[in-house]
Amino acid sequence: MDQCPIPTLLEHGNFSQVLFNNVEKFYAPRGDIMCYYTLTEKFIPRRKDWIGIFKVGWKTTQEYYTFMWAPLPKDQNKDSATQQEIQFKAYYLPKDVERYQFCYVDEDGLVRGTSVPFQFCPDPDEDIMVVINKEKVEEMEQLSEELYQQNQELKDKYADLHEQLQRKQVALEATQRVNKTLEHKVEEKASWEKEKASWEEEKASWEEEKASWEEEKASWEEEKASWEEEKASWEEEKASWEEEKASWEEEKASWEEEKASWEEEKASWEEEKASWEEEKASWEEEKASWEKEKASWEEEKASWEKEKAPWEVEKAPWKEVKAYWWNDLHR
């Protein structure tokens, strides 16, 4: 049987809204019983209402022995009381002689009606003698054995069905967990797809930037080649300067020797100085023409001066001596 949804504690309702009729004091054991009851005009039945058989003295609606779902009336719009009935199968009924009673419980767990107590045993007030021949007894015993075997088969089948239900419940829970995992993976995959699309766009941007870098690199390589050529030119020019410097060093040595001779000649120059004064006038005329040439020499000299700066430092003492002699020469 299905298990009814009942609360753990009894919730008392109005016990007079459902009235039980024709309740016997005794019901024959191992037999089906009919339960007759009346739904009063103010009571509204619902789909999950049920009727249970309770042992007298029960405290909560969980203490039912067995139950049946209460069928809804065919005409629920009637304003008058409605007669209903329900059958309880013998297999589900109590096997002891305790006192029991019917209880009508609505889907909220409230008891809406209770019956008078009854028992499952023969009526002691009835004195009935039943004579059954031997063949009938054997037939009834065989029928009882068959019913017992059917009962055992039903119990075994019920146990198997219950076990199958448990296994299916476990499988269902596992499937639900797998579904949740799959849903999580689908959501995670969608997130990854979005992130991948973002990466693809960023990669395309990097590829364009890389192409730009490659073009710029090619330009740098061309410029580097130009610098290498220019450097080679500078190296050649430097070699030329080194040769020229060596020449100037030789010339310096020559000037040193010449200086010595100039010192010797200086004495004679002093004697000739007087005559040079006379020639100075003519040299002044030539000086004007030299000044014109000097302008062009000065431009050429400016470029030489940049290259000759280190050498000029070394030649400075000689220039002073030469200037002194030159002034003495033109006095």
Curated annotation (Swiss-Prot):
The keyword RNA-binding does not apply. A motif (LIR-like) lies at residues 190-193. GO terms for cellular component: autophagosome; autophagosome membrane; cytoplasm; cytoplasmic vesicle; cytoskeleton; perinuclear region of cytoplasm; PML body. Residues 189-310 are annotated as: Disordered. A motif (CLIR) lies at residues 128-131. Xenophagy-specific receptor required for autophagy-mediated intracellular bacteria degradation. Acts as an effector protein of galectin-sensed membrane damage that restricts the proliferation of infecting pathogens upon entry into the cytosol by targeting LGALS8-associated bacteria for autophagy. Initially orchestrates bacteria targeting to autophagosomes and subsequently ensures pathogen degradation by regulating pathogen-containing autophagosome maturation. Belongs to the CALCOCO family. This is Calcium-binding and coiled-coil domain-containing protein 2. It comes from Mus musculus. The gene is Calcoco2.
